[in-house]
Amino acid sequence: MQLLKASDIISHLQIDGIFPGGNAIPCTHLNNYMNIKEKQLMNTIADVQSSRDLRNLPINQVGIKDLRFPITLQTAEGIQSTVARLTMTVYLPAEQKGTHMSRFVALMEQHTEALDFAQLRRLTAEMVALLDSRAGKISVSFPFFRKKTAPVSGIRSLLDYDVSLTGEMKDGAYGHSMKVMIPVTSLCPCSKEISQYGAHNQRSHVTVSLTADAEVGIEEVIDYVEAQASCQLYGLLKRPDEKYVTEKAYENPKFVEDMVRDVATSLIADKRIKSFVVESENFESIHNHSAYAYIAYP
């Protein structure tokens, strides 16, 4: 690679009429020169993805997947910083060879606002316009943290939840959905009934996917699920807390079937929620397999 000396750069600037002469190069002049040269260079490079495709096959979704990006969230409990994985796609018409992949990342680099459902809608609309498409979809997945208070000692600690928000636009119509995975404790009613000394219990993952006519907060979904578990989980417990959660789970046994039915009943009662799926996976402590249940509504 040939490196230009300072005198060579000055000569180029003088030839292009950007800097008339002298030995010092002001930053503004150099920036102007580089911008002009960059545009000239781009005009000489073939734009292959904008060429015409002859196979007559549209692509439903094309874009980037698993872009890791720092974001801030606007939640009921304030602003929270986290790291998200994004999948950003648009519809590609049959006659167009390819989409402009760099524009997806460029769009994220321009946005510094805290993410909520309103911001997700704006971001999706901007993406569709920027890529000159009729439809597009953005999925944002991230760990969500909530400060929880231990039931006896009152000590506070963080617990993490997996959350995904999705915004989708097609021909001007927009819709969004949310998915939250909530870890809880479940205790087996049958084991309690037949055992003299206790009952087997385990950690369970309850996943709620929903669409709503009005915004439903992440914290609200978490509350719906934790209220129906044998017991909640906590990041940090002292011995009095451990005694409490053990006994609470024992007093509130739930089959995996009970878990999904009770959570579904709570969601149906919320008139903002239009449709949902509830799944529960119990990581059975006495088996090498999980118990699983699923309800879709309506």
From Swiss-Prot:
Pathway per the UniProt entry: Cofactor biosynthesis; 7,8-dihydroneopterin triphosphate biosynthesis; 7,8-dihydroneopterin triphosphate from GTP: step 1/1
One BP term from GO: tetrahydrofolate biosynthetic process
Molecular functions (GO terms): GTP cyclohydrolase I activity
Taxonomy, superkingdom: Bacteria
Record-linked InterPro entries: GTP_cyclohydrolase_FolE2, GTP_cyclohydrolase_FolE2/MptA
Keyword flag Hydrolase: yes
Residues with site note (May be catalytically important): C188
Keyword list, A-Z: Hydrolase
Catalytic activity reported: GTP + H2O = 7,8-dihydroneopterin 3'-triphosphate + formate + H(+)
Gene3D superfamilies documented for this protein: Urate Oxidase (3.10.270.10)
EC number assigned by the record: 3.5.4.16
Pfam families for the chain: GCHY-1
Family note: Belongs to the GTP cyclohydrolase IV family.
Known function: Converts GTP to 7,8-dihydroneopterin triphosphate.
Name assigned to this protein: GTP cyclohydrolase FolE2
Lineage, top ranks: Bacteria, Pseudomonadati, Pseudomonadota, Betaproteobacteria, Neisseriales
Gene of this entry: folE2
